[in-house]
Amino acid sequence: MINALKGMKDLLDKDAYYYEKVIKTCEEVAKNYGFTFINTPHLELCTLFKRSVGESSDIVGKEMYEFIDKGENHVCMRPEGTAGVVRAYIEKKLDKNTSVKRWFYHGSMFRYERPQKGRLREFHQFGVESFGNASVYEDASIILMLVEIFSRLDIKFKLLINSLGCLKCMPKYRENLIHFLDSKEGFCEDCLRRKNLNPIRVLDCKNEHCQSLLNDAPLLNQNLCSSCQKDFEILQSVLKENGVDFEVDSKLVRGLDYYSKTAFEFISDEIGAKAAIAGGGRYDRLIEYLDGKSGFGVGFAMGIERIIAILEQKEEKVQREGIYLCAMDEIYIQKLLHIATNLRKEHKVLLSYEARKLAKHLENADKNNAEIFLCMGENEAQNESLFYKNLVKKEEKMIKISDLKKVL
């Protein structure tokens, strides 16, 4: 028997129900914030991610699915969504005008890492990207969008925020941090590698010993220039004004190299201690890194599998929907197919092609979470009627076929 690859799973039944629920909710909120849909390829040139995600990241260093294709191109399956969207923005020359572009996306991402709960090698993300707006109020709106999504999904969270500074204040901080790191011994191999490529990423290390060495490290948000400090204060003010609780985490740097200024992360204890369920921030330098005109960008990505895991723990009852249409004798099935075809213009209809007793049909309708049950037997056929039962309200009656649209 051929099985799915390790760390990759099929999406069906209850998982598919929750996936659709999450995506529908995210899309509705994103559209309310003025975002439109974009879809980028699953396969990109490796150079895109080496230049955007960064050589110091675990993604580029350890986790990319990469290979040489038949055209001798060095390609990889996309490990994250932002770089591809930025590439599309530049390729379509949208970086050359001054208009603001706001996009949302969702789909599969691929990373070769150890599979665990809420973390797969093929996983799904929902994300948004906003280009052309330098205002910190756009950063705040992006965060508030996530707050609204989690509110609609009834997911509890903790919001962590930080400022990573800009090209004006970051070089001095970087210099101070390198001096501090050089004064300490015992960092893990990942930290030593990151120290030479992007020392700020050392702060992101999950190794407990490394974290203990960083207890007295210089803090990012205490080395900000006046402009970055002002923006960070405005961000906190907006969140407070909108009733959003948050915590300033001075060691929050995000997992990718392209962030600057605002950085944020949403964590939840509902699927394990401090599990990240979404994160993002500002990445003004990324557009220029990818040969675009210097500009502004901010966005977030949300892990769908982790959200599904939280929703499944809540054991939410799957909502009934649609119509189950059936017959007690196969001679009526062709007529029901005609009825189903007309109903499907406005309704979800599941038509059974098997003639069964009423009780068996009702059992099957229940298994399929149908809301409305319609059945034709001999009496119904003679009277141009159907047996109707609302499986939510438990109402039942005979209805004329001519009255179907009115009743439904």
UniProtKB/Swiss-Prot annotation:
Organism domain of life: Bacteria
PROSITE patterns tied to this protein: AA_TRNA_LIGASE_II
Main location: cytoplasm
EC number(s) stated in the UniProt entry for this protein: 6.1.1.21
Record-annotated disulphide pairs: none
PANTHER family membership: HISTIDINE--TRNA LIGASE, MITOCHONDRIAL-RELATED, HISTIDYL-TRNA SYNTHETASE
Stated family: Belongs to the class-II aminoacyl-tRNA synthetase family.
Name assigned to this protein: Histidine--tRNA ligase
Species assigned in the record: Campylobacter jejuni subsp. jejuni serotype O:6 (strain 81116 / NCTC 11828)
Recorded name of the encoding gene: hisS
